[in-house]
Amino acid sequence: MSSSTSTIVAIASAAGTGGVGIVRLSGPQSRQIAVQLGVARLQPRHAHYARFRDAQGAVIDDGIALWFNAPHSFTGEDVVELQGHGSPVLLRQLVARCIELGARQARAGEFSERAFLNGKLDLAQAEAIADVIAAGDLRAARAARRALDGVFSRRVDAVAHTLTRLRIHVEAAIDFADEPLDTLGGNQVRDGLTQARTLLAQLLRDAERGRTLRDGLHAVLIGPPNAGKSSLLNALAGSERAIVTDVAGTTRDTLHEAIQLDGFELTLVDTAGLRDGGDAIEREGMRRARAELERADLALVVLDARDPQAARAAIGDAIDAVPRQLWIHNKCDLLSDAAPLDVNAIAVSAVTGQGLEQLHIRLRELALGDGVESVDGEFSARTRHVEALRRAERHVDAADLELGFEQLELAAEELRLAHEALGEITGKISADDLLGKIFSSFCIGK
């Protein structure tokens, strides 16, 4: 963790050359260092032109200096931004001069870490800074911006507040153990549990959507040989990415292809067909296919529409652990009109394009839910947020079960654990190693 007694410095603008480059200082010596660099006047929140000089008085660069006095700054400390020409050579020289004058090189994410430690933003908001920077399209950028504005954090806090009220009622009932729960606000507890479960379910749904907007979806094409998996990948990608032949077992290795679909990135993984037997190379391909399924968010189960039941047998239980599955009957252009089709499957033809539009719609629904946004709009989220919400949901369910048996101490503990899981999202309950891991993934100047 950083120490606010030190003053840190780093280049805050993007790597490479540009019209403008920024060096950022934060800490108690920031203003003093700026003055020693040659900034004659510094008023809070005013821009001042200056020539930045080295130890011998030679001009390093000229530009603008801005001072944000504590606590009215991003980090909550005294912050000075030096804006000069975007030459990496000059920016590095300016940083070196700041270090000579008493600053030290900032670690990755240390400015955001100090903002978190000084209460300027919570952990989910700090992570959203990196998400805004890394957003690949406008929809993801807007979702990250909402998370940075606190939309996600406020909803987490709303659930946490509900759990706090519940814990007060339950722990009060423990102090009066001789009284039945119903005489001690039992109905309020049950109503509160219902409210907490509803809020958590809605928040988890929206967080899963936010994670997809941020990270995309990892979808594995799985099925027996010659079902048309490679042809379907090519059709979805809009290019001939995979080799296609009539020979079963053509695909031996995995092939990854990322496509943009309605505002999120879908990574398609073509895999070897699953069947009994095959040579050593094909068996290795099938092993890799099963390994991909262990990491998959979505299994696209591709079967030959002419005999889907026989094809299902080849897959067995390989997809059981995948949270989301979509069954696709390919080669539907070869079916007669009277041929039966599983009502739970989508009929497509990778060759003619039949059914691909419906497949796109279904993929979007699986990735982003029903498409109904919350009143606050979409926000970005991360895998750790989703996992924490799932833990909270499990503990609330367990608390409900324990209350049914009037096991108040156990119910109170489950509610405490649910509250703790929510606290991990915003950083109100976080281990130092978790904070270090999160902030170390940031840019140096953030």
Curated annotation (Swiss-Prot):
Cofactor: K(+)
Predominant place of localization: cytoplasm
Residues engaged in binding (6S)-5-formyl-5,6,7,8-tetrahydrofolate: R24, E81, K120, K446
GO annotation terms (biological process): tRNA methylation; tRNA wobble uridine modification
Enzyme Commission number, as recorded: 3.6.-.-
Binding positions (GTP): 226-231, 245-251, 270-273
Taxonomic superkingdom: Bacteria
Free-text cofactor note: Binds 1 potassium ion per subunit.
Entry GO terms, CC: cytosol
Binding site for K(+): N226, T245, V247, T250
Xref: InterPro entries: G_TrmE (IPR031168), GTP-bd (IPR006073), GTP-bd_TrmE_N (IPR018948), GTPase_MnmE (IPR004520), MnmE_dom2 (IPR027368), MnmE_helical (IPR025867), P-loop_NTPase (IPR027417), Small_GTP-bd (IPR005225)
Keywords: Cytoplasm, GTP-binding, Hydrolase, Magnesium, Metal-binding, Nucleotide-binding, Potassium, tRNA processing
Example GO molecular function: GTPase activity
Subcellular location(s) per record: Cytoplasm
Binding-site positions, Mg(2+): S230, T251
Sequence ranges assigned to domain TrmE-type G in this UniProt record: 216-368
Transmembrane segments: none
Record function comment: Exhibits a very high intrinsic GTPase hydrolysis rate. Involved in the addition of a carboxymethylaminomethyl (cmnm) group at the wobble position (U34) of certain tRNAs, forming tRNA-cmnm(5)s(2)U34.
Protein family according to the UniProt entry: Belongs to the TRAFAC class TrmE-Era-EngA-EngB-Septin-like GTPase superfamily. TrmE GTPase family.
Subunit and partners: Homodimer. Heterotetramer of two MnmE and two MnmG subunits.
Protein's recorded name: tRNA modification GTPase MnmE
Organism: Xanthomonas oryzae pv. oryzae (strain KACC10331 / KXO85)
Organism phylogeny: Bacteria, Pseudomonadati, Pseudomonadota, Gammaproteobacteria, Lysobacterales
